[in-house]
């Protein structure tokens, strides 16, 4: 932002420290680079030389000739209504609040604390009401859905189709050995039979069954 507060004739300044601290004055003439001739006819400040280091320039400018007498300065001050405009600025309000805070007692600070807590509670409740109303408008009521259907839909949405087919194949492969268990047992029983004779070897002779004993003697 461009700086526009320059030292000039008619510029209104705020006295920050010194015997006239907190009052407004108007620059009537510039003496040198360090001092200016000021006058405050409506703030009870006599015409005198004042250093720039104790002045803070404001945005207000009065229209009167160079080295004008006090009556012309007063007339321009009242015409521009400087006192009312200054009281309405944020600068003046901050100064007033700072002075009021410095004069507060312990009981005054306690009352301010309780008032702030009450204000914050009211604001919080109102914000919650607005949030609930916004949620009700944003999400209309839907028909109730069974929990199982909701879980299945969520699982289907999370698991892609390829992964689902792979999982189905794995499950089928795991179930297949359990069904073929009897066949494996049968194969084990067949393996218990005597091995076949290899080529060039005679099969082992099998004993003929013994004849049954009869009651007649030869």
UniProtKB/Swiss-Prot annotation:
Sequence positions bearing N6-succinyllysine: 85, 207
* InterPro entries, sorted: Rib_uL2_dom2, Ribosomal_eL14, Ribosomal_eL14_dom, Translation_prot_SH3-like_sf
Which residue positions does N6-acetyllysine occur at? 79, 85
Q: For the cross-link Glycyl lysine isopeptide (Lys-Gly) (interchain with G-Cter in SUMO2), list the residue numbers.
A: 124
Q: What is its main location?
A: cytoplasm
Show the segment(s) annotated as 2 X 3 AA tandem repeats of K-[GA]-Q: 196-201
GO BP term, pick one: translation
Where are the stretches annotated Disordered? 159-218
Entry's Gene3D superfamilies? Answer: 2.30.30.30, 6.10.250.2270
- CDD domains, per the entry: eL14
GO cellular component, alphabetical, reads: cytosolic large ribosomal subunit
Q: Which UniProt keywords apply?
A: Acetylation, Cytoplasm, Isopeptide bond, Phosphoprotein, Repeat, Ribonucleoprotein, Ribosomal protein, Ubl conjugation
Q: Where is this region: 4 X 5 AA tandem repeats of Q-K-A-[PAS]-X?
A: 174-193
Q: At which residues is Phosphoserine found? A: 139
Query: Per its record, what are the GO molecular function terms?
Result: RNA binding; structural constituent of ribosome
The residue intervals holding the sequence repeats read 174-178, 179-183, 184-188, 189-193, 196-198, 199-201
> Where does the record say this protein resides?
Cytoplasm
Q: Fill in the subunit field for this protein.
A: Component of the large ribosomal subunit.
UniProt similarity note: Belongs to the eukaryotic ribosomal protein eL14 family.
Annotated function: Component of the large ribosomal subunit. The ribosome is a large ribonucleoprotein complex responsible for the synthesis of proteins in the cell.
Know the name of this protein?
A: Large ribosomal subunit protein eL14
């Amino acid at each position: 932002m461009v700086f526009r507060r320059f030292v000039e004739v008619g510029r209104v300044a705020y006295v920050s420290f010194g015997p006239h601290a907190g009052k407004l004055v108007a620059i009537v003439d510039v003496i040198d680079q360090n001092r200016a001739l000021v006058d405050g006819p409506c703030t009870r400040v006599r015409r005198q030389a004042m250093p720039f280091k104790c002045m803070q320039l404001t945005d207000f400018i009065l229209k009167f000739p160079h080295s004008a007498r006090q009556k012309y300065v007063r007339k321009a001050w009242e015409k521009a209504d400087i006192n009312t405009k200054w009281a309405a600025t944020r600068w003046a309000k901050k100064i007033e609040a700072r002075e009021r805070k410095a004069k507060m007692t312990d009981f005054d600070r306690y009352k301010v604390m309780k008032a702030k807590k009450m204000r914050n509670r009211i604001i919080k409740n109102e914000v919650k009401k607005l949030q609930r109303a916004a949620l009700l408008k944003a999400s209309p009521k839907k028909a109730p859905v069974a929990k199982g259907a909701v879980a299945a839909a969520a699982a289907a949405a999370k698991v892609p189709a390829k992964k689902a087919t792979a999982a189905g194949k794995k499950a089928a492969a795991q179930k297949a050995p359990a069904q073929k268990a009897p066949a494996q047992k049968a194969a084990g029983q067949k393996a218990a039979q005597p091995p076949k004779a290899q080529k060039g070897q005679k099969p082992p002779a099998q004993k003929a069954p013994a004849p049954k004993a009869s009651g007649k003697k030869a």
